């Protein structure tokens, strides 16, 4: 009975949120409270123990840091410089737009900021170069989605937090990189094939794009760029060294010390001390709606785990679906779910616990393949 109620609560949260535009996370928190206190015998204090504190802090702190680069125009000017330097290659415009969006998103801008910066540029440039604006916008969409999956960017941070919740802390770095690599390669292949088809069916464009020379990076923007690069080096250096030298103790220690959330807070404090942005503007751009949506669904899914629902679903999947077809199954399910809900706040928090259960029951199943298939399926229809 409790399992059916939790499934209904998940479906209702998504359905009501989709129809009424009420934040799905708020609905999930409300359902979690009602289910936990009336059906599972948990007190409100015990329910709060299921709140994904680590995930909440990481998303908040990293978005806070990269809001510095957004508010002072660093990311926008960087995008303009890259476009200006590639203006003599109009036939590669779709690829250039894709790579720029991927780079900006991977640098920490995340999906929505990258779309806001690059989509207007993409449409304008496609019209000037006699290219299809819809394909240009889709190239930006793919690039923003793939780049955000880097472990130091928006979506990648969420996945890292979810992996640690699943008990995959030692594998989180590898799992995140696997998702990132696949999610930028497969759209790249599609765009290459599309570009080749257009080139040979419509011919080459020999003229250069007319793009105004962008402004020089100001002192504030140069300092912001340096802080972004420094934070990525701190977060990436020791995990990479640990992969190469896994038995050196001091590398292992520092790998655990440089947490991206706390590094981001240090960088925010330094940025504010250097007056690289206004604190009020930086705080105002924190994506509270996404944070609430993600944490609320994670709370509801934690109750599903505690009730045994996730274990039951995992057992049903492993006993009814051949292991060979599991990646395709998760890819399709994630794609269908993503048509009506968010990849970060619904699809990943719902399916990752099921993958964890399947992995526990059948250790030989490759969780990298299942998690990557899930995200690729979701991104294909987002």
Task: Write out the residue ranges for each language-model feature.
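Hydrophobic transmembrane alpha-helices of multi-pass small-molecule transporters
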Residues: 1-58, 66, 181-312
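Short helix-coil transition sites and intra-membrane helix breaks within transmembrane domains
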Residues: 19-24, 54-55, 66-76, 104-117, ...
């Amino acid at each position: 009975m409790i399992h059916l109620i939790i499934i209904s609560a998940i479906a209702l949260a998504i359905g009501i949120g989709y129809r009424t535009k009420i934040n799905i996370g708020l609905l999930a928190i409300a359902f979690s409270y009602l289910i936990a206190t009336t059906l599972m015998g948990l007190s409100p204090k015990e329910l709060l123990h299921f709140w994904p504190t680590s995930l909440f802090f990481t998303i908040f702190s990293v978005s806070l840091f990269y809001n510095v680069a957004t508010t002072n125009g660093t990311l926008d000017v960087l995008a303009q410089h890259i476009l200006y330097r590639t203006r003599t290659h109009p036939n590669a415009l779709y690829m250039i737009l894709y790579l720029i969006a991927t780079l900006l998103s991977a640098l920490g801008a995340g999906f929505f900021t990258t779309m806001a910066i690059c989509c207007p540029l993409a449409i304008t440039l496609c019209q000037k170069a006699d290219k299809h604006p819809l394909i240009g916008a889709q190239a930006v969409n793919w690039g923003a989605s793939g780049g955000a999956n880097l472990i130091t960017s928006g979506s990648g941070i969420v996945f890292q937090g979810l992996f640690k919740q699943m008990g995959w802390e030692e594998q989180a770095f590898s799992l995140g990189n696997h998702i990132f690599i696949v999610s930028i390669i497969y759209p790249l292949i599609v765009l290459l094939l599309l570009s080749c088809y257009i080139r040979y069916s419509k011919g080459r464009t020999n003229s250069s794009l007319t793009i105004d020379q962008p402004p020089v990076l100001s002192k504030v923007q140069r300092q912001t760029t340096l802080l972004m690069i420094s934070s990525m080096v701190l977060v990436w250096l020791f995990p990479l060294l640990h992969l190469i030298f896994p038995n050196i103790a001091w590398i292992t220690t520092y790998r655990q010390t440089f947490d991206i959330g706390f590094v981001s807070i240090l960088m925010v404090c330094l940025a504010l001390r250097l007056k690289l942005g206004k604190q009020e503007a930086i705080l105002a751009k924190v994506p509270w709606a996404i944070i609430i949506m993600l944490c609320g669904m994670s709370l509801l899914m934690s109750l599903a785990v505690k009730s045994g629902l996730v274990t039951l679903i995992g057992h049903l999947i492993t006993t009814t679906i051949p292991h060979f077809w599991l990646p395709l199954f998760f890819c399709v399910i994630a794609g269908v779910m993503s048509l009506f809900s968010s990849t970060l706040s619904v699809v990943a928090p719902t399916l990752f616990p099921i993958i964890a259960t399947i992995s526990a029951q059948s250790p030989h199943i490759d969780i990298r393949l299942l998690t990557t298939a899930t995200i690729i399926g979701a991104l294909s229809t987002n």
